[in-house]
């Protein structure tokens, strides 16, 4: 009898739909989707009653509030902007490289209109979508030709399939990396149709290891830049120039997967040496592959640059169409590459600006936020301290950049609860938790985001106390 009474307390769908709180949603969205969300709430309540989790009759307003929250949650975009206070510049989970304003504007112009993606406006005949970026890539890298696909893993698969299908590809055992998401070089190679031939050991590989492994079925010598981990101690690896020399001696092409792939030597900004795309190609490598959304600072893309004879063959490969880039990637990449020709490109490309920004400038932003938080007299212990940022994106492993951070120790709620509340905002604010304090690293927080950070912290620190 008690169960029946509880079930009878569940309002009807039509009654909920008449509630004033839902009228704006009904005016804006299709009635069917709002009705479906209301039914989902009622079904959940019914299940809770039958299972014994709910033992009190339902109040009508309570159900309306639940329905409203369900609808709001549904229409809140799952993919939304995030203020990055983690200090990780190329945060994979946050989309890696933020685009430069010029690239964003290029996206805006082409995404909402038509464009000459595959049309030569001079001749009026069909063109190639790759023409929009190939000239810039060749000019910047010194390559004879270039091709862009949807990501670097695709670039590697395409290059291997085109250059060494059914043939052996010799690679050092110490370079058989996992590139993220459980995707590993051996598995990628298998899908390409190439045959993996490992040489050397995890910590030591010599040029003679490659030489001894070469036979009549060798199709390619492959080097993989281990940008996402570092082996130290008793190690030895083969220099790019030595592998190129062996390749020329034996008439075997050499390919190098650079992964993060920088066009800029960042050693003068406190980062360790990493070979640039230009240096690898200048050393004589036939084909190099790298990402567009890491150190380059552009959209997600896999870039293939190198000798014309190899790249031209890839452009005709059947796989190329399956992994080609769309008009938005073309526009964003073209705009990003154009910035590299400007004198002040380091300050215009967000990733490079963040990586090369002096700690003194970061400190000024940190002081600005710190003063705002102190003036707000929030119920928390707040301090400004030196900190360490990371490059991220599988680049420069074990390398930290000097930065400045705000540390927050809430008085009336746990640091985990604060972090969760900030994550659920729109835009979300992400930081990191260290020693029971919420940390905001100002290296990755933009000047225009400081006031927003202050408002969110005030909302959740003061709001929780009230």
Swiss-Prot record:
Its EC number is 2.9.1.1. It is an enzyme of class 2 (transferase). GO terms for biological process: conversion of seryl-tRNAsec to selenocys-tRNAsec; selenocysteine incorporation. Its main location: cytoplasm. GO terms for cellular component: cytoplasm. One of its GO terms (molecular function) is L-seryl-tRNA(Sec) selenium transferase activity. Pathway: Aminoacyl-tRNA biosynthesis; selenocysteinyl-tRNA(Sec) biosynthesis; selenocysteinyl-tRNA(Sec) from L-seryl-tRNA(Sec) (bacterial route): step 1/1. Gene3D superfamilies: 3.90.1150.180, Type I PLP-dependent aspartate aminotransferase-like (Major domain). It catalyses: L-seryl-tRNA(Sec) + selenophosphate + H(+) = L-selenocysteinyl-tRNA(Sec) + phosphate. PANTHER family: L-SERYL-TRNA(SEC) SELENIUM TRANSFERASE (PTHR32328:SF0). It comes from Carboxydothermus hydrogenoformans (strain ATCC BAA-161 / DSM 6008 / Z-2901). This is L-seryl-tRNA(Sec) selenium transferase. The keyword Hydrolase does not apply. Keywords: Cytoplasm, Protein biosynthesis, Pyridoxal phosphate, Selenium, Transferase. Converts seryl-tRNA(Sec) to selenocysteinyl-tRNA(Sec) required for selenoprotein biosynthesis. NCBIfam families: selA. It comes from the Bacteria.
